Amino acid sequence: LTPVHDGYEATLTDGSTLIVDTVLCATGRHPNIEGLGLEHTKVTLDSRGYVKADAQFQTEEPSIFALGDMTGGPQLTPVAIAQAMAFAHTHFGNDSKVMDYEFIPTAVFSQPNIGTVGLTEESARDLGLELQIFKSDFKPMKHTLSGRDERTLMKLIVDKSTDRVIGLHMVGPDAGEICQGMAVAM
């Protein structure tokens, strides 16, 4: 990155350049396990420093369970909530539940919102599924009277053999919230 009068000149790995006004530096995440005393237990860590746990959230230490961001899976609020529910059902409700990661809603709360849940068209095709793809570009109903020209883009991926929605991808107002509701239906 080189500062220029209009922002920054970014040199890409292929040698090409582009001028940008904003740079987002995403440095990643690491588990915050310092001070927990795990070194005095049988708990093991993976190569990235995340706690290893099985499908029931059991670590190598019989009295220690691990779930959420410290286990290295998708670091999303809906995942942590679903893991907590599965853990509670299994360990306190006598109803064994295994976490299902298939339809995790994700959102980028930017302007406009970006939301997604389920499979992408590419990943569904890689599974050999015959698909129906539905795309829509529309003005949200809440803007009918306001006169705002904000648009929403939506794409549904449907398994043709079952007529089941297996993916939803959306850009527009409240996309993250809408995808969370769709995840429940899916």
Residue ranges and their predicted role:
Residues 3-8, 61, 147-152:
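A short, glycine/Asx- and small/polar-enriched loop/turn
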Residues 2-4, 46, 157-161:
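Short beta-strand micro-motifs enriched in acidic
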Residues 4-10, 43-52, 139:
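Short gly/ser/thr-rich secondary-structure transition/capping motifs
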Residues 1-8, 74, 78-107, 111:
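Glycine-rich flavin
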Residues 17-93, 184:
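FAD-site-proximal beta/loop scaffold in flavoenzymes
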Residues 4-18, 23:
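Conserved beta-strand-loop-beta-strand element in the redox core of flavoprotein oxidoreductases
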Residues 92-93, 104, 109-186:
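Flexible, glycine-rich terminal cap/loop adjacent to redox cofactors
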Residues 12-14, 55, 160:
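Short acidic, glycine-rich loop/turn motifs
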